[in-house]
Amino acid sequence: MIGRLRGIIIEKQPPLVLIEVGGVGYEVHMPMTCFYELPEAGQEAIVFTHFVVREDAQLLYGFNNKQERTLFKELIKTNGVGPKLALAILSGMSAQQFVNAVEREEVGALVKLPGIGKKTAERLIVEMKDRFKGLHGDLFTPAADLVLTSPASPATNDAEQEAVAALVALGYKPQEASRMVSKIARPDASSETLIREALRAAL
């Protein structure tokens, strides 16, 4: 089991980051809310990971702290929620915002996330609220919504295409992802900025 990585960021291609540890490159899938806080390529990062084994793949999911990882592990225990959907949920809102939405039973906020219908949102609220009772000491407590900010990477010529590709990887349909990016696109924006603003606008 790989629970933590400390190494140099080689490449950032949202929502994937390549981290080199001891000469080995680990490809890690990260929620965008965690991805935004990563340092730039060439710098050292510490990522808490959860290892998922499937018939066709072995995947690493990464987080900035143990609390975010704990929430991810609880999410994938929910009926109908796999790692991909859990990643999309924690990309659309921060871990703290998700906890707040569940505690306040905000179905409307959850259904705006990709892959979440009303029934899934209601099931998440029922199941997760019950689990939070025993997790608050190790997870989060209801609080004001947090807005994550971090320095954006310099804009690239294909920033919009990268943003669309990342949104598709998170579960949005290609046409929907293109529409989301085109609504907030501007020439000087990096792909990370476009993704963050597109997800924020969707909520």
UniProtKB/Swiss-Prot annotation:
Primary gene name: ruvA
Similarity comment: family membership: Belongs to the RuvA family.
GO biological process, one term: DNA recombination
Gene3D superfamilies named in the record: 5' to 3' exonuclease, C-terminal subdomain (1.10.150.20), DNA helicase RuvA subunit, C-terminal domain (1.10.8.10), Nucleic acid-binding proteins (2.40.50.140)
Keyword Plastid part of the UniProt annotation: no
Entry's free-text remark on domains: Has three domains with a flexible linker between the domains II and III and assumes an 'L' shape. Domain III is highly mobile and contacts RuvB.
Region span, Domain II: 65-142
Source superkingdom: Bacteria
Any one Gene Ontology molecular-function term assigned to this protein's record: four-way junction DNA binding
Name this polypeptide is given: Holliday junction branch migration complex subunit RuvA
Region of interest (Domain III), residue spans: 155-203
InterPro entries per the UniProt record, alphabetical: DNA_helicase_Holl-junc_RuvA_I, Hlx-hairpin-Hlx_DNA-bd_motif, NA-bd_OB-fold, RuvA, RuvA_2-like, RuvA_C, RuvA_C_sf
